[in-house]
Amino acid sequence: MYRRLGEVLLLSRAGPAALGSAAADSAALLGWARGQPSAVPQPGLTPVARRHYSEAATDREDDPNFFKMVEGFFDRGASIVEDKLVEDLKTRENEEQKRNRVRGILRIIKPCNHVLSLSFPIRRDDGSWEVIEGYRAQHSQHRTPCKGGIRYSTDVSVDEVKALASLMTYKCAVVDVPFGGAKAGVKINPKNYTDNELEKITRRFTMELAKKGFIGPGIDVPAPDMSTGEREMSWIADTYASTIGHYDINAHACVTGKPISQGGIHGRISATGRGVFHGIENFINEASYMSILGMTPGLGDKTFVVQGFGNVGLHSMRYLHRFGAKCVGVGESDGSIWNPDGIDPKELEDFKLQHGSILGFPKAKVYEGSILEADCDILIPAASEKQLTKSNAPRVKAKIIAEGANGPTTPEADKIFLERNIMVIPDLYLNAGGVTVSYFEWLKNLNHVSYGRLTFKYERDSNYHLLMSVQESLERKFGKHGGTIPVVPTAEFQDRISGASEKDIVHSGLAYTMERSARQIMRTAMKYNLGLDLRTAAYVNAIEKVFKVYNEAGVTFT
């Protein structure tokens, strides 16, 4: 059974009655039993959640195995949705056969299908030779191509790429992007290499992936991740298109996150951070959730802290700042800064570009202690995995944790946040903006035309004809004795009169995707009485969608 594979431990079988009246009321909010009606939350009550956790994932509570951690979260979702999957099966099997089918497919979904481990030599600029290690994990091919970033870090490991690949599968499913999950890592510190050496490493890694069948527009499509960006993606695209893909007209679709000149798309660089903003916006504007947290809806009076001032942290900060929230703290690996009056993201970005660090920023002071425990409304961990653990979770002061990074919260910390009535907007939803816009870029590369190019002039002419038609109708009705009756477009309409640009289409598509997925998560949380356990609701949605693909496609050669 799939739950035994994850060694699920039911942490508590105690009912609400054993916990006292306050806990009983709050337990009703989170739904102790499937099918139990949830009570209206009473002010001041702290919900207490008890869910299925993976024993394997929590055996090292402050530093759990990352892949087992993801498997544990999967098990929680699977345990809740199993009965519905059995009920929805439209086959002529009996109840036991249907349940066996469901459990069998869930066992298929859970493991990582392929892991490629590579070692290859490069010659450094000083003439010395070095062997570089790299990995590419493909979690699922239920949809192809597989999709996932490439990171450069000395912390890269098989466990990490497997965990991140599995998260990508569920992330794509949550936001309805038709990809399987994958992830790659090269075990280097890019700061220790020249640009020429990094190009050698990137191009050689691309060739090794190509030789093993781990890259291609319809096979496996990498993207930027930690310490990689447009430059590295351009090298990958050029290497693939110049070698194994030289006969493939779609060769540049082998990777996303490219520069515009290489087939990239407007809005990709900021996509993950913009997705974080939209995700927070969708939940913070939902009055029912804010009433549980004791907060007012909207961003206007909210403060936030960002851990990690890279691509995700910077753009999350920019958009939240633009829409009225105040950034009071920013943390990086070399230290943190604090200003209760607010930190301007553009000024901080310029300072870091000039000095290489946020420390010393003149409009903020150094923050002593962990920035994760700073006083704020919204905490955005946008650095690396396993930052919020059993040790520091009790001291977190934020009421909303928005997971900009992948896997920043351990299972034990997640349990503590539920018990403390803290909302966690989960990673597999919140940071899906990057893969969503990567999907748009991939489609652009396959179509060989930018969004909006075919309709710009037609839409502009149509809009002017519409305005002229209105003007002529008014003049026929009221006459011209007082002069013409000009119909002047508003400033907002004037901006859109030529139709949507590529950036407009990308931003609109991303906003719609994040809003629709948020509504799906909210409905699932309500349906299963999950309360603030949005992570489990997101996993339930992902599991249902992936299960449907496997079930309807059939399992070959069984």
Curated annotation (Swiss-Prot):
Name the active site residues.
183
UniProt transit peptide range? 1-53
**Residues holding substrate:** 147, 171, 438
Record PTM N6-malonyllysine, positions in chain: 457, 503, 527
Q: Where can this protein be found?
A: Mitochondrion; Endoplasmic reticulum
The record lists ADP as bound by: 450, 516
Alphabetical list of InterPro entries matching this protein: Aminoacid_DH-like_N_sf (IPR046346), Glu/Leu/Phe/Val/Trp_DH (IPR006095), Glu/Leu/Phe/Val/Trp_DH_C (IPR006096), Glu/Leu/Phe/Val/Trp_DH_dimer (IPR006097), Glu/Leu/Phe/Val_DH_AS (IPR033524), NAD(P)-bd_dom_sf (IPR036291), NAD_bind_Glu_DH (IPR033922)
Q: Which keywords label this protein?
A: Acetylation, ADP-ribosylation, ATP-binding, Endoplasmic reticulum, GTP-binding, Hydroxylation, Mitochondrion, NADP, Nucleotide-binding, Oxidoreductase, Phosphoprotein, Transit peptide
Q: Which reaction does it catalyse?
A: L-glutamate + NAD(+) + H2O = 2-oxoglutarate + NH4(+) + NADH + H(+); L-glutamate + NADP(+) + H2O = 2-oxoglutarate + NH4(+) + NADPH + H(+)
Summarize the record's induction comment: By water maze training in the hippocampus and in other regions of the brain including the laterodorsal nucleus of the thalamus and the cingulate cortex.
Residues bearing PTM ADP-ribosylcysteine: 172
Residue list for modification Phosphotyrosine: 135, 512
The residues forming the signal peptide are none
Binding-site positions, NAD(+): 141-143, 176, 252, 444
Looking up CDD domains in the UniProt record yields: NAD_bind_1_Glu_DH
Could you say which tissues express the protein in this record?
Widely expressed throughout the hippocampus. After induction by training, highly expressed in the dentate gyrus, pyrimidal layer and lacunosum moleculare.
Q: Which residues carry this modification: N6-acetyllysine?
A: 84, 90, 110, 162, 171, 183, 187, 191, 211, 326, 346, 352, 363, 365, 386, 390, 399, 415, 457, 477, 480, 503, 527, 545, 548
Activity regulation, per record: Subject to allosteric regulation. Activated by ADP. Inhibited by GTP and ATP. ADP can occupy the NADH binding site and activate the enzyme. Inhibited by SIRT4. Inhibited by HADH.
Q: Which family does it belong to?
A: Belongs to the Glu/Leu/Phe/Val dehydrogenases family.
State the PANTHER family in the record: GLUTAMATE DEHYDROGENASE, GLUTAMATE DEHYDROGENASE 1, MITOCHONDRIAL
Q: Write down what this protein is called.
A: Glutamate dehydrogenase 1, mitochondrial
Q: Which gene encodes it?
A: Glud1
